[in-house]
C-alpha cells in the first residue's frame, strides 16, 4: 500500500480536529504487480472529526493485478463511536492512469462515515478494467454533497460513474 497523508485512530472524544490543508500530494505509486488488494491513496483519514480543504492530489497509480486493488485521492473511514461530521471542501483531485485497480477518487468506505462534501473539483480519466467513480459512498455512510464538479472519463472494460451509491 502507498499513501501520501495518513491519519489513523484519531481520538475525537477530546474534541481535537484533524486538519489537512493546502497540500500538494502527487506521484503516489504502488509498483507491486501482485494479485492483491493493494491501495494507492492520496489522503487517508480514519475519523469524522476532520477538515480537508484546499488540497491538490494527482499522479496516483497502482500496478496491482487484482480487481480488488484501489486508487483513491481521498479515502474516508471512521469508528462506530465517532458522532462528528467531517468537512471536505475546495479540493482538486485528479486521477489519470491505466490500471486494473478500482478508481474511486473520493471513497467513503465505512457505514459510520459522515461528511459534508462541498465545492471540490474531481477528475478521473485513463483506463481501468473495473468500474470507476469520482465519488463512491458505501451503503450506510452519510454525505451532504453540494456544488462539486465530478467528471469521470475513464475508459476500458468497466463503466465510468460520477457517483456510486452502494445499497443494502
Model-predicted segments: where are they?
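Extracellular beta-strand/beta-solenoid scaffold signature
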Residues: 1-12, 33-44, 66-80, 99-109, ...
